[in-house]
């Protein structure tokens, strides 16, 4: 047990000694000394100044290393995200469309297109007069709900529908005259 304590004590003294007498290999450390490297240093302030400089250099270098490491990690994360986006997110986009409301909008557009085609076919066939009771239409417009649960009581929509119906009634009732 004594030998372990002795070895630990020698190790601590060795480490402490190496911290106090750092080798001056680089030009930066050599420039910080006013005396030449061969002359012994007798001023304790100069030793402390050297120690502070080497600690600051280590801290600065370590900070630069950590910054570059964070940048590398971030770039790696971006690359992995992009790589995963191509495989997984395409399946997720189909479900996301409905959540965004574009799917509902596409269905509404399709249904409106179908109604327009049916109406044009009805006009071309020229079958009987179709009446549009306006009181029922207004009540129907006010009571209709959208997929998100909100009422469609916007006056612009109602007025546009009424104007369209009036125009269609005018077209149906007007006689076509041929000018030759």
Swiss-Prot record:
Keywords: Amidation, Cleavage on pair of basic residues, Hormone, Phosphoprotein, Secreted, Signal
A biological-process GO annotation: positive regulation of calcium ion import
Top-level taxon in the UniProt lineage: Eukaryota
Entry-annotated residues carrying Phosphoserine: 54, 105, 108, 150, 152
Inducers of expression: Glucagon release is stimulated by hypoglycemia and inhibited by hyperglycemia, insulin, and somatostatin. GLP-1 and GLP-2 are induced in response to nutrient ingestion.
Record-marked site positions (Cleavage): 52-53, 83-84, 91-92, 97-98, 130-131, 145-146
Reported function: Oxyntomodulin significantly reduces food intake.
UniProt protein name: Pro-glucagon
Organism: Rattus norvegicus
Lineage: Eukaryota, Metazoa, Chordata, Craniata, Vertebrata
């Amino acid at each position: 047990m004594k030998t372990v304590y002795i070895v630990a004590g020698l190790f601590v003294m060795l480490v402490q000694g190496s911290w106090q007498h750092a080798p001056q290999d680089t030009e930066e450390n050599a420039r910080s000394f006013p005396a030449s490297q061969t002359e012994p240093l007798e001023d304790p302030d100069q030793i402390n100044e050297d120690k502070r400089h080497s600690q600051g250099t280590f801290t600065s270098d370590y900070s630069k290393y950590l910054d570059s490491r964070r940048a590398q990690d971030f770039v790696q994360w971006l690359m992995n995200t992009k790589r995963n986006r191509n495989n997984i997110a395409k399946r997720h986009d189909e479900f996301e469309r409905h959540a965004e409301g574009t799917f509902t909008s596409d269905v509404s557009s399709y249904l409106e297109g179908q109604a327009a085609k049916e109406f044009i076919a009805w006009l071309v066939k020229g079958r009987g007069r179709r009446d549009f009771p306006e009181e029922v239409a207004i009540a129907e417009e006010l009571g209709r709900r959208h997929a998100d649960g909100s009422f469609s009581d916007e006056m612009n929509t109602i007025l546009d529908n009424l104007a369209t119906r009036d125009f269609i009634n005018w077209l149906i009732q007007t006689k076509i005259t041929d000018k030759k």
